[in-house]
């Protein structure tokens, strides 16, 4: 595997998140309904847009991402963001899964008042993202300021017929979390 510095890997990961989750049209690619993009076309379009992108750099980002944000298709010809999409082009068909008793959501403390009023909503994304452990939730929340960890009564939600899914990188997904299912 080729050597790349941390900044180059982080910048490439952010670029891939942008085009594979939110704005594929920004560089002229099209994602299929499951979020897959042809790798050769992605590289070509990225280069035309002035981004340095190679298969070796993609391989390194996919292999070394601690959050496993991206995956390759079984034939190695396509790449996708595992979850976190806001583009209407994508509707990944995750299999419904029974969650553990509790899941966790990390957020910045400045969002707490709004969450206490409306619960957790997906916003521009397709799903609310939840973690199986508090440490991961804390890292997620810290990205936006002083973090607060919310406990989600996931099994109670599931018993009431509210569905959960789990992305291949372990992130739990649900459509919304009402205030009654949250512990502060």
Curated annotation (Swiss-Prot):
GO terms for molecular function: NAD+ poly-ADP-ribosyltransferase activity; tRNA 2'-phosphotransferase activity. Its EC number is 2.7.1.-. Keywords: NAD, Transferase. One of its GO terms (biological process) is tRNA splicing, via endonucleolytic cleavage and ligation. The keyword NAD applies. It is an enzyme of class 2 (transferase). InterPro entries: Ptrans_KptA/Tpt1 (IPR002745), RNA_2'-PTrans_C (IPR042081), RNA_2'-PTrans_KptA (IPR022928), RNA_2'-PTrans_N (IPR042080). Belongs to the KptA/TPT1 family. Removes the 2'-phosphate from RNA via an intermediate in which the phosphate is ADP-ribosylated by NAD followed by a presumed transesterification to release the RNA and generate ADP-ribose 1''-2''-cyclic phosphate (APPR>P). May function as an ADP-ribosylase. NCBIfam families: PRK00819.1-1, PRK00819.1-4. This is Probable RNA 2'-phosphotransferase. It comes from Escherichia coli (strain K12 / MC4100 / BW2952).
């Amino acid at each position: 595997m080729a050597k790349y510095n941390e900044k180059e890997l982080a910048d490439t990961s952010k670029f891939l998140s942008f085009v594979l989750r939110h704005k594929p049209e920004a560089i002229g690619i099209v994602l299929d309904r499951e979020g897959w993009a042809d790798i050769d076309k992605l590289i070509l379009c990225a280069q035309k847009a002035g981004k340095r992108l190679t298969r070796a750099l993609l391989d390194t980002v996919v292999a070394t991402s601690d959050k496993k944000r991206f995956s390759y298709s079984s034939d190695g010809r396509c790449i996708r963001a595992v979850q976190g999409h806001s583009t209407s082009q994508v509707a990944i068909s995750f299999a419904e899964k029974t969650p553990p008793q509790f899941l966790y959501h990390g957020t910045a403390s400045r969002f707490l008042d709004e969450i206490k009023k409306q619960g957790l909503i997906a916003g521009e994304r397709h799903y609310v993202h939840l973690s199986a452990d508090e440490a991961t939730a804390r890292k997620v929340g810290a990205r936006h300021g002083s973090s607060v960890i919310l406990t989600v009564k996931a099994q109670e939600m599931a018993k009431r017929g509210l569905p959960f899914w789990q992305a291949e990188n372990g992130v739990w997904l649900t459509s919304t979390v009402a205030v009654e299912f949250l512990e502060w």
